Amino acid sequence: MDWDQDRSSTELRKEKSRDAARSRRSQETEVLYQLAHTLPFARGVSAHLDKASIMRLTISYLRMHRLCAAGEWNQVRKEGEPLDACYLKALEGFVMVLTAEGDMAYLSENVSKHLGLSQLELIGHSIFDFIHPCDQEELQDALTPRPSLSKKKSEAATGRHFSLRMKSTLTSRGRALNLKAATWKVLHCSGHMRAYKPPAQTSPAGSPRSEPPLQCLVLICEAIPHPASLEPPLGRGAFLSRHSLDMKFTYCDERIAEVAGYSPDDLIGCSAYEYIHALDSDAVSRSIHTLLSKGQAVTGQYRFLARTGGYLWTQTQATVVSGGRGPQSESIICVHFLISRVEENGVVLSLEQTEQHTRRPPQLGTSSKKGIPGNSLDPPAPRILAFLHPPALSEASLAADPRRFCSPDLRRLMAPILDGPPTAATPSTPQAARRPQSPLPADLPDQLAVGLENAHRLSTARKNKTMETDLDIAQDPDTPDLEMLAPYISMDDDFQLNSSEQLPKVHRRPPRTARRPRARSFHGLSPPIPEATLLPRWGSDPRLNCSSPSKGDPPTAPLTPRTRKRALAQSSEDKGLELLETKPPKRSPRLEPGSVLLPPLSLSFLLQGRQLPGNQPDPRAPLVDSHEPLGLAPSLLSLYQHEETIQSRNHFLPAAGLAQTH
């Protein structure tokens, strides 16, 4: 019995709860229905709104009501017929009012013609949900109030001009798509940042209550038309042009001759910045930067220079058009709208407005000097004419010293002709008499080929003579070979163990009549390979054996007891290469800066030695012991005066020797 009573009470409570929720929902629906009918929309539109849309539109309506009541909106004249219907027809865009947070408080009805989205779908939403992510920072900067930069004027700048990319569901044919398939459309927005102070209200206690001012951004958004959608007759106040990405003219309409005085051929290849007033170049540059980043842009009013002087106020709509794949196929199509006629006619503001200024580089004519071999070294044509025909100079001054008026390349080329062949100067012959008379500039082109031929002949004769001298020296059997000399080792970084006061005098080599052979790559030709008898290999030359000295070697003096000569074993070429484990003996430390190179000695002369009696060479023994000093032949020691002691193989002396030296 008790259980039935508890069950009935629980069901009664649930039934009451359901009835209360049903009544609450019905009341909420009735209130929202009343709100929907109070909104300034048609009944057919408001009847299909959901609860969230009704709340969103109601909040936006309350914001606009406060805004209209706070500002100058309520001061509408009652006289005359209303012009609200004509405003939207006159505008090429739609009106949008944004709050400081970025919510769209109001949009005009014609927004659907430009974006494809209805007015009810956008009002109350945040604009950041419908613009490109890269443009959000720019819009946030436009919504931020800017302080005044002038001390005299306390009012801050309220004007705003920027471009936005908003979502559009319209296709090129005018059909509407789903919001998920929307594309980006560039809108040029211009307007002002307004701050309206609401009217003062009194509190129930009787004290006045103030509210913060209402800030909003009122914009007129205009869609930039694509050049393909324009009708061909643009009218007399507009002309079309095509540019490369660096704003150089590639095409221009013929109507520019009527409005500005230029012919299309004068503009092709020139930059558009050359025909813009200098004070407007910064604003146009910012518009071009917007064009390259967003694809479309509209410039402000700027001054386009006229041909005969003065300027025209112009506004340009630019679009980046791609003709194929890659950035090289892209071009910029500009539609220029003239706002005024030519102002300040006759005032020259740029070089492009002068008759003397040539906009294109002059084309060089074909000259008849193609057969002259020296033309490839000459500078461009204006520089050549300046050297051949200098202004305000007589022919006598040119003939006196023609080298003064020649370019460096021409002077180097004609040096054999102007200077003449090197001859022995006599005391009775003056210098001016030995120099040949230079031809006049007028006769120079005709005699240039002959002079070049003589110069070539002279240089060839000198080269052959030098090569014959070098070959004779190289074939001389008494001349030492450079490849067989000991390598030069600089002693600049070694320590000077001897004091400067005890330095002996350097033995100077007697002057030689025959020159040393040049390097093999000096003339581009290698000297002939000497005979095998002149280039003995290591261990294969019989003259290297101490038991049988060669006939041409100089006699050696008796050795001192402190020195011992190392004998070279006579073996085959392979054994000589394997047994050789030492370097040629080094010379004494550098004495003076003048004594740099050793005298040219052959390898057999440097390594000549005599075997001590009672010692037989061991073929398997190393040639030189690293712990024993390397002795030099007396013939080599005789090259250095006051140097009779034998130097150790190492560069540094022991401590005892160092103490004795000092």
Swiss-Prot record:
In normoxia, hydroxylated on Pro-487 in the oxygen-dependent degradation domain (ODD) by PHD. The hydroxylated proline promotes interaction with VHL, initiating rapid ubiquitination and subsequent proteasomal degradation. Ubiquitinated; ubiquitination occurs in a VHL- and oxygen-dependent pathway and subsequently targeted for proteasomal degradation. Residues 80-150, 225-295 form the PAS domain. Residues 572-584 have a biased composition (Basic and acidic residues). Keywords: Angiogenesis, Apoptosis, Cytoplasm, Developmental protein, Hydroxylation, Isopeptide bond, Mitochondrion, Nucleus, Repeat, Repressor, Stress response, Transcription, Transcription regulation, Ubl conjugation. The keyword Repressor applies. The modification 4-hydroxyproline is found at P487. Induction: Up-regulated by hypoxia. This is Hypoxia-inducible factor 3-alpha. It comes from Rattus norvegicus (Rat). The lineage of its organism: Eukaryota, Metazoa, Chordata, Craniata, Vertebrata.
